[in-house]
């Protein structure tokens, strides 16, 4: 099922645990700034277990998904697939025994996915398919039925779906703009072509950075973002002067 909601992805940091962490404890992966913000919001609502953390290495390397510590009775697993600030991404599709909730705000439509492996995907529009003010939700049918009925309608995913994403007056211009961008994606070759372009553009930058004795990218090369290329300077004094 597909739902368009108002607001940004940050609203999902609280809506997700409100709807799906009413009985069991969710697992959260701390793999960057946005994942960390999601954890801080979820803690206000429910108990949270951090199943992996890359904080100690300053988010420059992430454990393989298969090595995350996830209890079999977790409500769900949440993580951000592409961390914009740290310039790091999770390459693997989820393969958990519990539902996967994935923030794809900064990488949706930039790569091909096996959508069947994801239970809940969310993405704000302003990074890859429009202007701020709308959020795309892709949710499996059985999970939608588990939305918390005790919540006000505006915070309940099922209520939004039942009203065709028009529970209240939607951001019509945001929808219109997203539609224009979706059309452009199709005319430009679709997701596979976008993936080729993302790899090509990011590789050009990484090749320059890696061959330089001036710039540095500290991220594990196998986990570097294709959408957000970060760099520092080898000379910390110059870096401080630049900033």
Residue positions per predicted region:
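Conserved beta-loop-alpha segment that forms the PLP phosphate-binding cup at the N-terminus of a helix
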Residues: 1-26, 35-38
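Conserved PLP-binding catalytic core of the aspartate aminotransferase-like
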Residues: 216-243
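Active-site C-terminal subdomain of aminotransferase-like
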Residues: 125-206
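Conserved active-site segment immediately N-terminal to the catalytic lysine
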Residues: 101, 115-126
